[in-house]
């Protein structure tokens, strides 16, 4: 898809940047989850491979791996209770809360900008310290949000 839909436009523009959305789930085992983490791990490899293939065309390819980020899913699971989401997230994120979409967007904007002109093939964890904590707790987190 990249080769057909994206590459020609960026090539015609003389280069550019692609940012893929992966997830912290791509790097850790999580109870009761298989397909999502596997698909996100595959996208990490796609990011690295595209970075190698597109570098000569002045196209940078990176990815962001968000931690828990306030979204429709979390809103629905908690009936809109952001404070509850943050309480549950505190056990899994060093910064003690879920992220905001705008915080992830700031990293994406950086990666798409000229300020990231020497960055390619990298994955940025925008995860409030989740990945620094090591293994996820053995107690599943998603059911706690729905309680």
Show where each model-derived region lies:
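Active-site loop immediately N-terminal to the catalytic Tyr-X3-Lys motif
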Residues: 28-34, 56, 96, 114
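Active-site helix of classical SDR
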Residues: 3, 39, 47
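C-terminal helical subdomain
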Residues: 63, 83-119, 124-128
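Hydrophobic alpha-helix immediately C-terminal to the catalytic Tyr-X-X-X-Lys motif of short-chain
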Residues: 42, 46-50, 54, 64, ...
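Residue(s) in the substrate-gating loop at a strand-loop-helix junction
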Residues: 23
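A glycine/serine/threonine-rich, flexible loop-to-helix segment
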Residues: 56, 67-93, 133-147
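Alpha-helical segment proximal to the catalytic Tyr-Lys
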Residues: 8, 52-56, 117
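Active-site loop-to-helix junction immediately N-terminal to the catalytic Tyr of the SDR YXXXK motif
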Residues: 29-37, 49, 77, 137
């Amino acid at each position: 898809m990249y080769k057909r839909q994206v590459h020609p436009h960026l090539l015609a523009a003389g280069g550019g940047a692609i940012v893929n959305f992966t997830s912290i789930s791509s790097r850790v085992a999580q109870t009761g989850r298989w397909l999502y983490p596997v698909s996100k791990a595959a996208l990490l490899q796609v990011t690295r491979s595209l970075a190698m293939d597109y570098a000569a065309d002045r196209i940078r390819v990176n990815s962001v791996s968000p931690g828990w980020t306030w979204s429709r899913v979390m809103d629905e699971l908690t009936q809109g209770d952001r404070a509850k989401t943050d309480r549950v997230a505190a056990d899994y994120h060093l910064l003690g809360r879920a992220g905001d979409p705008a915080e992830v967007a700031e990293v994406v904007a950086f990666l798409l900008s000229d300020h990231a002109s020497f960055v390619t093939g990298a994955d940025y964890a925008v995860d409030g310290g989740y990945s620094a904590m090591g293994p996820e707790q053995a107690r599943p987190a998603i059911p706690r949000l729905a309680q």
